[in-house]
């Protein structure tokens, strides 16, 4: 039986610009659609009628359009070809979005196949804990967001994040919080308490929000103060901006 196709935004090769895998080359598979509307989101909201962009040569931006839904066979063949033609270049496959867990039904069938070629790295907003539980056995590493109200505009997600983290903790995982000048101490305290309540050794990354013109929306001293606050609860807290934006990468 053939695997179901997926509504994708793009498939391409680039360096990871955020989180614990920063600087490593990945195959990015960007799923379309999200369950949240964050104020700082930089991902285009495509519609099902629009084609997916698929890069032909890794990192060269020679995109061609592909009708949605895109088949697993096409994506798997692309990854296999890149692995054969550029051995050792890619560290892993980034399953990103949008929010890929919206299509957990597709992920349950796609991930075992993709994982035959490279480890699977799931980038997620950290809310859909039930969906994570369904695919967790096919994931190697999880980059999870905690959405704080001051920068994301999202509220009342704390319990969802806690439940999500309890499942994510069964894999290698780290957490990212986008912070800005408007971020309040209580937000970092509450997030840090949630993380420490599950596992204080899970790394936390404070990511300065990127504003228009690729400028950072937080003063250095403010970022340091938030880091100092989180370090009261957690063993590893880093400040890392979106480096791919500085390099002109996707």
Swiss-Prot record:
The Radical SAM core domain, residue ranges: 21-250
Any GO BP annotation: queuosine biosynthetic process
Sites where the protein binds [4Fe-4S] cluster: 34, 38, 41
Record: residues binding Mg(2+): 43
UniProt entry keywords in alphabetical sequence: 4Fe-4S, Iron, Iron-sulfur, Lyase, Magnesium, Metal-binding, Queuosine biosynthesis, S-adenosyl-L-methionine
Pathway: Purine metabolism; 7-cyano-7-deazaguanine biosynthesis
Keyword Calcium: no
CDD domains linked to this entry: Radical_SAM (cd01335)
Cofactor note: Binds 1 [4Fe-4S] cluster. The cluster is coordinated with 3 cysteines and an exchangeable S-adenosyl-L-methionine.
Binding site for substrate: 15-17, 30, 96
Cofactor names: [4Fe-4S] cluster; S-adenosyl-L-methionine; Mg(2+)
Residues that, per the record, bind S-adenosyl-L-methionine: 98
Coiled coil regions in record: none
Family note: Belongs to the radical SAM superfamily. 7-carboxy-7-deazaguanine synthase family.
Subunit structure: Homodimer.
Annotated function: Catalyzes the complex heterocyclic radical-mediated conversion of 6-carboxy-5,6,7,8-tetrahydropterin (CPH4) to 7-carboxy-7-deazaguanine (CDG), a step common to the biosynthetic pathways of all 7-deazapurine-containing compounds.
HAMAP family: QueE
Protein name: 7-carboxy-7-deazaguanine synthase
High-level lineage: Bacteria, Pseudomonadati, Thermodesulfobacteriota, Desulfuromonadia, Geobacterales
Protein's gene: queE
């Amino acid at each position: 039986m053939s695997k179901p196709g997926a509504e994708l935004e793009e498939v391409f090769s680039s360096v990871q610009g955020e989180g614990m895998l920063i600087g490593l080359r990945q195959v990015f598979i960007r799923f379309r659609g999200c369950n949240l509307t964050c104020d700082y989101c930089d991902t285009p909201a495509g519609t099902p009628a629009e084609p997916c962009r698929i890069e032909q040569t890794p990192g060269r931006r020679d995109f061609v359009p592909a009708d949605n839904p895109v088949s697993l066979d096409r994506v798997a063949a692309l990854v296999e070809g890149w692995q054969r033609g550029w051995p050792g270049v890619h560290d892993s496959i980034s399953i990103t979005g949008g929010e890929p867990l919206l299509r957990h039904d597709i992920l349950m069938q796609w991930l075992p196949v993709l994982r035959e070629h490279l480890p699977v790295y799931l980038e997620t907003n950290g809310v859909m804990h039930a969906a994570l539980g369904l695919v967790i056995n096919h994931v190697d590493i999880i980059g999870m967001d905690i959405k704080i109200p001051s920068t994301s505009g999202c509220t009342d997600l704390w319990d969802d994040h806690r439940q999500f983290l309890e499942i994510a903790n069964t894999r290698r995982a780290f957490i990212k919080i986008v912070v800005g000048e408007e971020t309040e101490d209580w937000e970092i305290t509450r997030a840090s308490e949630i993380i420490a309540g599950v596992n204080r050794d899970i790394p936390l990354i404070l990511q300065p929000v990127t504003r228009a013109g690729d400028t950072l929306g937080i003063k250095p001293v403010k970022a340091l103060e938030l880091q100092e606050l989180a370090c009261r609860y957690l063993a590893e807290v880093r400040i890392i901006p979106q480096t791919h934006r500085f390099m002109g990468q996707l």
